């Protein structure tokens, strides 16, 4: 059997109407993931691919994360088509945080929009370290090299403020509608000497499997199976789960021995990051652990925070956030109400540099360093130590109001 290709999750980010869906649609078409007859006639034929839902067709807005798949020579990709509309930013949080790399789409005729900046900062906050920039709608600006270079310079300055090196980031002039420089070099841009989008996708670094980090396995469900015993189920974020190993569940505070591991009805000796497993634990009862607990080895158990410092971005809050505010934090499989103990420093959202000490409140668009106290102990890790376990979304009133990461645990269990 041929070795399976490495899998890569790809987020498409950028301002609404800059052509993300059209670009994804054309990419899928050119890479043979969809048949031509599936496409509508005329202007919006490629966007159809991503907008399968009726309501979306009417509004001409991409809502859902369309998990479309395509392959290149090197990778198999799942496209997380991240919506650009304001009220769909929460999708971007669940979407972008699953992504190994992002394609930022910027329209040549519009240039940098507020959302362009926001998405760059947000994707960085969510741990995306590989970026490709597609300067789209080149057909609208008559394939102007000057326009391309001007935007490339502006975008280079912008991405360097959040820690991307412009020299490491490919800038590609494309037309999502006409298909220029997507899978084949375009004769409309003879001045462009770089690679096509597909070549740059193939040149991305393989996603690291964080096997060298300590084991962290957030629990999704717990079953009790007759004749077997307690079987927690979850997806390994970091490290390796092995049979006969002693593991600790936090914040439950119980330990047990791994007797067996199963994935897709197949028995395994060990399981790696990305694997969805069920495993039988001796010495732990079904009611001792629950969704939101995290398993680690007894030598290096998960960190339980009673208080932590975080960097957050306020995405959409109808009012202001002040000290004492207690929304629900969603981290891995846990959902815990947490209180803002202090607002420490307001940051410039474009650069991450300090702007104001101890602000009175935070509002939509603000970035800040804050101190957080969970209302009950929860597992969260320092982003620098175990990045996969350090991110969270903050939800309130049925919407995602902020996203962030834990930068220090100041009081642990």
UniProtKB/Swiss-Prot annotation:
E.C. designation(s): 3.6.5.3
CDD domains in UniProt: EF1_alpha_II, EF1_alpha_III
Positions annotated to bind GTP: 14-21, 81-85, 136-139
tr-type G domain span: 5-211
Superkingdom of source: Archaea
Gene source species: Methanosphaera stadtmanae (strain ATCC 43021 / DSM 3091 / JCM 11832 / MCB-3)
Renumbered residue ranges of the record's region G4: 136-139
Gene that specifies this protein: tuf
Protein name in UniProt: Elongation factor 1-alpha
């Amino acid at each position: 059997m041929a070795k399976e290709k490495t899998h890569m999750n790809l987020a498409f980010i950028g301002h609404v109407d800059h052509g993300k869906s059209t670009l994804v649609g054309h990419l899928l078409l050119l890479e043979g993931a969809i048949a031509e007859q599936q496409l509508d006639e005329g202007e919006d034929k490629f966007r159809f691919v991503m907008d399968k839902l009726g309501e979306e067709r009417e509004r001409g807005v991409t809502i859902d994360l369309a998990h479309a798949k395509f392959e290149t020579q090197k990778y198999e990709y799942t496209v997380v088509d991240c919506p650009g509309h304001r009220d769909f930013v929460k999708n971007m949080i669940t979407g972008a945080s699953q992504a190994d790399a992002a394609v930022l789409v910027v329209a040549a005729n519009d240039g940098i929009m507020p959302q362009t900046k926001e998405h760059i900062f947000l994707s960085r906050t969510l741990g995306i370290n590989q970026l490709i920039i597609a300067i789209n709608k080149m057909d609208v600006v008559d394939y102007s090299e000057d326009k391309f270079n001007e935007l490339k310079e502006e975008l280079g300055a912008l991405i360097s403020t959040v820690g991307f090196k412009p020299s490491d980031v490919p800038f590609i002039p494309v037309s999502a509608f006409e298909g220029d420089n997507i899978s084949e070099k375009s004769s409309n841009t003879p001045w462009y000497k770089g690679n096509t989008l597909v070549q740059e996708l193939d040149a991305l670094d393989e996603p690291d499997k964080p096997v060298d980090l300590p084991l962290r396995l957030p629990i999704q469900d717990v079953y009790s199976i007759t004749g077997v015993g307690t079987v927690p189920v979850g997806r390994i974020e970091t490290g390796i789960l092995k049979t006969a190993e002693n593991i600790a569940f936090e914040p439950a505070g119980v330990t047990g021995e791994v007797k067996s591991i199963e994935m897709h009805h197949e028995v395994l000796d060990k399981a790696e990051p990305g694997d969805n497993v069920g495993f039988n634990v001796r010495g732990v009862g079904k009611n001792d652990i629950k969704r939101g607990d995290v398993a680690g080895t007894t030598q290096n158990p998960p960190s339980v925070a009673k208080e932590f410092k975080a960097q957050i971005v306020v995405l959409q809050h109808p009012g202001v956030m002040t000290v004492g505010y207690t929304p629900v934090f969603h981290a891995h499989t846990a959902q815990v109400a947490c209180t803002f103990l202090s607002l420490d420093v307001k940051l410039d959202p474009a650069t991450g540099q300090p702007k104001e000490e101890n602000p009175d409140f935070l509002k939509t668009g603000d970035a800040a360093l804050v101190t957080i106290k969970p209302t009950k102990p929860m597992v969260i890790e320092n982003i620098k130590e175990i990045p996969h376990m350090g991110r969270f979304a903050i939800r309130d009133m049925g919407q995602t109001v902020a996203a962030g990461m834990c930068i220090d645990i100041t009081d642990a269990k």
